[in-house]
Amino acid sequence: MECDKCGRDAVMQAAYSGSHLCETHFCRSVEKRVRRRIRADTLLGPKATPENPETWVIGLSGGKDSVVLTHILDETFGQDRRIEMLALTIHEGIEGYRDESVDACIELAAELEMRHELVSYEEEFGVRMDDVVEENPENMAPCAYCGVFRRDLLEGYADKYDADKLLTGHNLDDEAQTALMNIFQGDVKQIAKHFDASIGDFEERAEQDDFIPRAKPLRDIPEKEVALYAQLMELPAHITECPHASEAYRGEIQELLWKLEENHPGTRHSIMSGYEELAELAADRYGGDSDSDDDSNVGGDSDGEGDSDGENSGDSDDENSDADLSECERCGSTTSGDICRKCQLLESIQAT
């Protein structure tokens, strides 16, 4: 099988496009699509200047998605004085798993000479995910706890560092899964929230003064292509499934998408093309009035590497609703009730 561009041996065949690409042209293709998404979403604001640069916080877990995202962002903007990038890594407290991915984060950040911050559940909340899973006071899936805690730290530290954007490594598979979940659940307000929070053009999104805007530059790239890019570029990605990963409903959707894509190449792209148009219409109707979280998958790495970063946790706790927001009585974070979901969970865990 030869590369369509140069005739060299192809390393991938994209059934959805019919293209065959060698290593060089495949990597260029991934980078080109990511940069096209960055331009389409107007990720770099027009007011950013070397004198007044934007700050981008990147959720870096050490999994393939976040590592590829960080690498391409550095390749694209590393010398651009209009942007200051900071990689944020969160240690959940999962023995025999997270330490290796943290090492990958440290290695990548050092290689790129990028500022890198490491925080942990244990230091911030006094809990470790291994213990939470064992006790499970709320009888929930581990990802539900982890998503709430991770989202709180991502948003809290993004705010601490005065971030203008919070970037996560969601790929095409992640986003198509979330789209189908929202549609199957009939949650139109959630679809509107998804648009305003993380998939709409920044110039078209509703104002969200209480939350750092999110961006997902990898959301046009299939998961397998992200993994292949990481391998070919020899990036220090930790590709191992989180031992606590368990999202039954999302897993069903994932398997459904795999079958549809296999039988009908291009299904994921078609889903997202239509979904984004519907999401924009929903945002026009419900923008600023949604009662649920941003989608249910934060950070990408849908293979269970623990890079969920709170967004796709499957826990809809209303923390990102713009309606009737106030400060949590316990920690001061923004919430739609008296006590935020994170503090509710911590209280439940500490009571066991």
Residue ranges and their predicted role:
Residues 2-192, 232, 296, 302-308, ...:
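ATP-dependent adenylation/nucleotidyltransferase module used to activate substrates
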Residues 9, 91-93, 122-124, 197, ...:
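Short, solvent-exposed coil/turn elements at secondary-structure transition points
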Residues 16, 24, 28, 99, ...:
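Electropositive phosphate-/nucleotide-binding environments in soluble metabolic enzymes
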Residues 79, 259-263, 331:
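Histidine kinase transmitter module recognition
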Residues 149, 173-262, 270, 300-319:
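Catalytic subdomain that performs nucleotidyl-dependent activation
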Residues 261-268, 273-297, 309-312, 317-320:
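Glycine-rich phosphate/adenylate-binding loop
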Residues 277, 283-288, 294, 317-352:
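C-terminal, charge/polar-rich interaction regions
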